[in-house]
Structure formats: C-alpha cells, structure tokens
Design a protein with these regions (language model features):
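Short, solvent-exposed loop/turn segments at secondary-structure boundaries
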Residues: 65-68, 216-221
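A conserved pocket-lining segment of Rossmann-fold NAD(P)-dependent short-chain dehydrogenase/reductase
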Residues: 138, 156, 165-177, 203, ...
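Active-site proximal helix/loop that lines the substrate pocket
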Residues: 58-62, 101-104, 210-216, 246, ...
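Conserved active-site helix of classical SDR/Rossmann-fold NAD(P)-dependent CH-OH oxidoreductases
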Residues: 77-78, 186-193, 226-230, 259, ...
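C-terminal substrate-binding subdomain of Rossmann-fold SDR/epimerase-dehydratase oxidoreductases
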Residues: 2, 234-380
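A short beta-to-alpha transition loop/helix N-cap that caps and shapes the active-site region
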Residues: 16-17, 105-108, 214-215, 284-285, ...
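N-terminal Rossmann-like NAD(P)+-binding domain of SDR-like oxidoreductases, especially those catalyzing
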Residues: 1-208, 379-380
Length: 380
C-alpha cells in the first residue's frame, strides 16, 4: 500500500488461527475477500484483474493432518497456475512470490571433522569448513531416528565414523524434507519453477526460517517458540526447553520478511529462484528463552524436562548470501524481535488458556514425547 499498489487479500479466517474473525489490523484501504485459496471459485474471483500474487496461504502445524498439508499448501499452488493459464485475459498475473520454508532442507547440511574434533557447535557457521581433513566432509543427513530421540541423544552423528557433526549454513540447494508440511512446501517449489517456466509466469520461492514478531497467532499448536515461551513466562511458569535447549535456530523478524517479499517481487534477478530468508545469526533455543525471560522481566529459569517434538530438526541456520546479493539484509536483531513480540502479546486476551490446550493436544496425538533416559527436569 505504501508503494502505491492496490492490494486485495484472500483469507478464509480459519478459526484455529483467527477465532475472532477478521483481525483489526487489516488495512481499510486493502480489499478483503473472505474465501479459501484451495477453492477454485474463491481463488478465481480473487485473481481477476490481478498483476502480482503473494501466495502466503498455508496450513502449519505439528499435528498429523497429512492430507490437509498437501491440500492447502500444494494443491492451492497448483490451482493457482491452473486458473491463470485457463484465462490469461481475466487473470493477467505477471509474477508470483511463494512462501516456502526452511523445513524443506530437512536436517540440513553438516560437516564431519572426525572423531574427537573439538570446538563449539557454531564453529563452521562462522568460518569455512576445511577442504581436506580427518573426517568425512560435508554431509546431508536424514532425520534422527525415534530410537535416538527416545535415548536422549540429540546431536547428529556421522554414519561412517559416529563423530558428532558440526552444522553448516544451509544453502538453497539443500533439500531433504521429512515432515508432511515440509514435503508440501517442497512440492510448491517444484510447481513454481516447472509450471512458471512452462507458462511464462516468473516465480520466486522464499524459504523463511523461524519468523517471529507481533500478530503471530498463538491459537494453533504450531505458533512457535516465542509464543510458547512468552505465554508460560507471563503466566508465572518457566519456559520448557525441548531436547536440551542447545538447538541452533535462525530467527527473523516479520518486517524483514515483508521487505524480502517486496524485493523478490520487484527484482527480476530473483525470478525462478529459491531464496533463503533468515536472521543471519545462530541463536540457541536456551539463549532465546533467556532473552524472553529478560523481556518479560522474569527471574525464572528455563527447564529441560527431557521432552522432544517429533519432526523437529536439530540445528537450522540459513545461508542468506544469495538474497544479500540482491540487496536485502536483516535489520531487526533478535533482542528487539523478542521485546516487540512480548509487548504485543501482553495486550491479547485469553492467550494462556490456548497454550495449555495446544500442548495437551500435541501430547495426546504423540507429537510431544519424552525420552526414555533419565527424565528428571534440569535447570539450565
């Protein structure tokens, strides 16, 4: 809107995300259509006379709703092309920017430096890995097994020598989705590139990392670590760390993501590319919890209770150099990201009640599990 675009929004206001209907922050200057992106009638109506599309509609959760992931995420992307190709005069779309996810990369990219290799887990996030060495080099491991997680063995290991692996920045060529959500997003990337080229519709897929900031719905089980930690702390409870809290994450502010979307739309050099959108800094989940405690003014301590979440990756830090070369960089540090989210959350009604309900549902459906080794809670 600030750049002079006429904006039309299509949203089905799913109750699990928007239980009170249309959010008050939707701009009055934007045309709002109530409808479903997976409905040919609704999407066709929304596309009439449209030049550019941001496809942000998605079903996100840790629950085992496998067919829903494919229907909402991948099928709606295929339907988008189908409707445009069927009538280019009524739907003269010139470019589409798709929201993808770093989850497409699966466990990501690691280095085996050999048994006994020393140094912090972030060692090769900050420096280039050696071209030669005693280990087995760069690896792209599969997901950790249920047996490994039940035993409380959180790190990834070399399949050849058993050495603990060092995480590397994840580039856009890395793909190994292992959850239904990630598989659906990978399908979107393939549809965008193949169908976009075939029918002459430029596309860009943005792989978001852990997007944080105000307006992040806390009504579904997926909403993320910021919501989960903040709601517990504001209700006088310590933040609970899954695994041991040493997972490395890459948090990016929603406003930085919005800027990346506009750049992808307006720069032809981005056409037919997959681009990582991350915060540019590796932060452990434990460190993030401490930032959240500080922002909430709490003296509580994080607790590691031996729980883990099925489908979680161990370390996820994006290589954002490709997007940087196009002129983008993250501007909002994680500390500010946390502070502004807490300020927004304090103003929301009945937030704590939904947190408890979401965690109960994940436990009942086997998404949150407990390791079989010593389960005694530890303060870290």
């Amino acid at each position: 809107l600030e750049r002079g675009y006429q904006v039309r929004i299509l949203d089905n206001l799913q109750p699990r995300v928007h239980p009170y209907g249309k959010p008050p922050w939707v701009p009055e200057r934007a045309e709002f259509l109530l409808g479903d992106a997976a409905s040919a009638e609704d999407l066709g109506r929304a596309l009439e006379g449209v030049d550019y599309v941001f496809h942000l509609a998605a079903y996100q959760d840790y629950l085992p709703d496998f067919s829903t992931f494919m229907h909402v995420n991948a099928e709606s992307a295929a339907l988008l092309f189908e409707l445009i190709v069927a009538d280019r005069r009524r739907r003269p779309v010139k470019k589409i920017v798709f929201a993808s996810s770093q989850s497409v990369a699966g466990e990501g990219k690691y280095l085996c430096a050999g048994p006994g290799a020393a140094g912090p887990r972030t060692r090769y996030l900050e420096q280039a890995p050696p071209e030669e060495g005693p280990g087995h080099g760069v690896l792209r491991p599969g997901p950790r097994s249920s047996e490994q997680l039940r035993a409380g063995d959180w790190e990834l290991h070399c399949p050849h020598c058993g050495a603990t692996l060092f995480p590397l920045p994840i580039d856009e060529e890395t793909a190994g989705p292992h959850t239904a959500y990630a598989i659906s997003k990978y399908a979107v990337e393939l549809l965008a590139e193949r169908l976009g080229r075939r029918y002459g519709i430029p596309t860009v897929c943005l792989r978001y990392t852990y997007v944080q900031g105000p307006r992040n719905s806390f009504y579904n089980a997926y909403s993320g670590v910021a919501r989960r930690f903040a709601l517990r702390i504001l209700n006088g409870l310590p933040p609970v760390l899954y695994e041991d809290g040493e997972q490395l994450r890459d948090y990016v502010n929603v406003r930085d993501v919005a800027r990346a979307n506009l750049l992808a739309l307006e720069r032809p050099e981005a056409d037919f590319q997959v681009l990582n959108v991350g915060g540019g800094r590796a932060v452990t989940v434990r460190e993030f919890a401490r930032l959240m405690l500080e922002a909430c003014g709490s003296s509580l301590e994080p607790v590691a209770a031996g729980e883990y979440r099925v489908g979680d990756t161990r370390h996820t830090v994006s290589d954002i150099s490709r997007l940087k070369r196009l002129g983008w960089k993250p501007e909002i540090p994680v500390e500010e990201n946390v502070r502004e989210y807490v300020e927004w959350l304090r103003q929301q009604p009945a937030a704590g009640e939904r947190l408890a309900a979401a965690e109960r549902e994940m436990q009942q459906r086997g998404v949150i599990r407990r390791r079989e080794a010593s389960c005694r809670a530890q303060r870290v």
